Amino acid sequence: MKKRVFAMLMACVMALSLMACGSKSDSGDAGNNGGDSGVETIKLGGVGPLTGGYANYGLSVQHGAQLAVDEINAAGGVSGKQLELSFQDSQGDPESAVAAYGKLMDWGMNVFLGGVLSGETASVVTAAKADDVFIMETTGSADKCIDGNDKAFRVCFYDSYQGTAAADYLNDNQLATEVGVFYQSDNDYSAGLYNAFVAECAKTGVTIKET
């Protein structure tokens, strides 16, 4: 998990570097992107379940992101600027994620790392667009969780990609012609993978016997 989050945050850092370089030739308002030459710290914000049923997942992402921030800062930061991370608890609830996002904006967030869960990101993506905040989504994998925001980008696989890849692997390696599937229908991530898996199995001839 730490390696995955580190790689994701490094992608964010590269994007920030480009933004910082671009701001040098921009005499206008730098907005909330952390590119203002007067800003010594780039504030990164994240939202996720630090308590509740999904806390183990949220805490892993938070700790991995903080580790990456510490290592990047120790190496000199981004274009001479230090990174600062604030991670707010959503308890895994989309409505609580909106309140958590609001706290990050009050704090002065420059870049939003998205929600740990897809539903969290989907609940704030419109507000982030209105606030002109750059989003680098690191773990929310639902296909449409960042739709409608042209400043939102993603560095993780889509659910449909993962579900399709799983079905293709099953078929390509002739592992089974009939399968049963356990999934959580009220969980966006689980349901997204399931739907893509079932759709691809229908194309490859693998029969879903039980779900």
List the predicted regions and their residue ranges.
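Short, low-complexity disordered leader/linker segments with a strong preference
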Residues: 1-43, 74, 106
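Beta-alpha junction/loop-to-helix N-cap segments that form part of ligand/metal-binding clefts
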Residues: 28-32, 36, 56-63, 75-146
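Extracytoplasmic "Venus flytrap"
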Residues: 38, 42-66, 88-94, 117, ...
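Structural recognition of the beta-strand scaffold that forms the well-ordered cores
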Residues: 43-47, 84-87, 110-115, 133-139, ...
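Alpha-helical elements of the RecA-like P-loop NTPase motor core of helicases
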Residues: 55, 95, 122, 164, ...
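Flexible, small-residue-rich helix->loop connector segments that border functional cores
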Residues: 66-78, 170
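Short acidic, glycine/proline-rich loop/turn micro-motifs
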Residues: 147-151
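An alpha-beta-alpha
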Residues: 152-211
